[in-house]
A protein has these predicted regions:
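Acidic, surface-exposed loops and disordered segments
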Residues: 1-154
Length: 154
């Protein structure tokens, strides 16, 4: 029930108070929610960038749909999906996973071979569409975490 209450509180903010700043602790929780988001094949095919620097936000404003929001918000969080799956990216994710879990590299070899067979054969547009969907899942969980913390978002 708390989740529904938090989501009911959430809305797309149209203007921010530039004098209010979100704490590092809250930003870290929002990013952690994105990191823990489920993704197809466990690849998490995106990077999350946090922009707090005002001059950098001013540069980003030029391409924004609501430039005032980007200029005045405390932080800009960018979800940058990969352009496509590659053998190197798949290997990097699973090498990291095995290293973090103290397992031998190659333990997931048959699984990663299957992923490569599927993803590398797809056209770039299909890869990117799949990656975008995985990125939106992480974005959704980050927005949910922001709502739980009562941090406004757009």
């Amino acid at each position: 029930m708390a989740l529904l209450e938090d989501l009911n509180w959430r809305h797309a903010v149209k203007a921010y108070d530039a004098t209010k700043k979100v704490s590092k602790e809250d930003i870290d929780k929002i990013i952690e929610a994105a990191r823990l988001a489920p993704s197809s094949s466990g690849l998490q095919p995106f990077n999350v960038l946090v922009i707090e620097n005002q001059s950098l936000k001013e540069k980003l404003v030029k391409g924004a749909l609501n430039p005032e929001c980007m200029r005045d918000c405390s932080h800009v969080i960018i979800f940058a999906g990969w352009d496509r799956y590659t053998e190197e990216r798949i290997d990097k994710v699973y090498n990291y996973t095995t290293d973090e879990r103290g397992l031998e590299r190659g333990r997931f070899g048959s699984y990663t071979d299957m992923l490569k067979k599927i993803y590398l054969a797809q056209p770039a547009e299909e890869n990117f569409a799949h990656i975008a969907r995985q990125t939106y899942i992480a974005l959704g969980l980050a927005l949910g975490q922001a709502a739980e913390l009562k941090v406004d978002s757009t």
